[in-house]
């Protein structure tokens, strides 16, 4: 009965399928070896390259295919012969389950050995050795007639055959030469028939020998061609055998490495078992601490490690609680006060002491509830502030201001505005607004009390009468005057609109034209229209009526 291999199975890779069935039974996942076959044999690592989706199915983390250089995937069971799942000790209880596991492990090892034997050179139904289409490598040269012949020996034989063929061809060429010479002799021996006949006979004999040599050479050529074909097939078989041998060697090395790794793991597990103090039901008590290089997952409703505990319920009004503390009191805890989905105002951090922070940013609001105060404390000789609730008002209270006094200063970094609270007054560095009133830094005051004017302007306009002082800036020539129309002259002092002792009543064109109306009891009323231009240096009498100017004076301001 032919042996059917059960512990090794290969699947074709198509670049899309990632799930493959495991057709055989196994005792532990570490006994299942997954290998990609293509440009090389790539052994995959569990969790990194694949995982067990179910007990009978693996799922690759990547869909491999011919584009990656791999065409098939091999699932092989390699049960450890050193990592015993059951280790019997004197005085232990002998259970059927343990015996079955030990027996199954032994059966698995035997089954894998049988499959490994079936996967190598075997005997076919006729009793002949069968290499199963693979190469036989590292084969010695044949000695006896019934020995297997390596490809190198065949190549040597082929070289000898080719040499014989070449020699036969050389003999044939020489025979052709002899025949040609015979023909020449025949033509030249017209007068000597006897000699010619003799030469002809010799030539015919040479021709027969040449034909014999040609036939022999043809046989050699045919034999050489057959030898070349056989040598080529032998070369292919030898290369296949070499590849299989390399694969077998690599597989053996991998098995040895895995056996060594499993032995190391078994040693680690034995050491781990030695660190267990006792077991109580599903609980495990360790002799020492537990150190985890990665994340530590714990199930059920929480855990307690002495100075830190976490639980997810079991106490009214407290859910998802994390507490830090000592045996008699908890120093800090974070909890969700109500079992709801709401997060805002439902999370609280309680600290039974001071919070000392070296730095950091707070992105959310800081709320003080139940009348508690916020203390901003620095060094003993520096500013200390307290934000507390006084009645219905929130007040800033200062315990100490600067190094030498108790002043409290509020400063705007952007606007450069300062407000300093002294014991009995306040100091500001810019205008101070009180309602609709404004107090300037020079002492001036503006407000509705003064008609929205500054106080100095209001007093000047209402109560103060100034004595006007004038300075003459132009005079007409002696015994002459300027009539209306187009008279002009130059002032010796620049005049502008602020120095006229006049009120402008009209503007004509682009130049300022001022009209002076002189009040009088005589009729008609006298008036003067004039213009100052050229940056206040040129006076022009545009028109006048009974008021020709003789001089111009400006107010001293």
Swiss-Prot record:
Compartment(s): Virion
> Keyword Cytoplasm, does the record have it?
no
Question: Where is it chiefly localized?
Answer: virion
Q: List the keywords (alphabetical).
A: Host-virus interaction, Late protein, Viral attachment to host adhesion receptor, Viral attachment to host cell, Viral tail fiber protein, Viral tail protein, Virion, Virus entry into host cell
Protein transport as a keyword of this entry, yes or no, is: no
Compositionally biased, Basic and acidic residues: which spans? 198-212
Give the UniProt record's GO annotations in the biological process aspect: adhesion receptor-mediated virion attachment to host cell; symbiont entry into host cell
Q: Name one Pfam family in it.
A: Phage_T7_tail
In this chain, composition skew of type Polar residues spans 187-197, 235-249
Role of this protein: Structural component of the short non-contractile tail. The tail comprises six fibers made of gp17 trimers, 2 nm in diameter and 32 nm in length. May attach to host lipopolysaccharides (LPS) to mediate primary attachment to the host cell.
Cite the record's note on assembly: Homotrimerizes. Interacts with tail components gp11 and gp12.
Quote the protein name from its UniProt record: Tail fiber protein
Origin species, per record, is Enterobacteria phage T3
Gene coding for it: 17
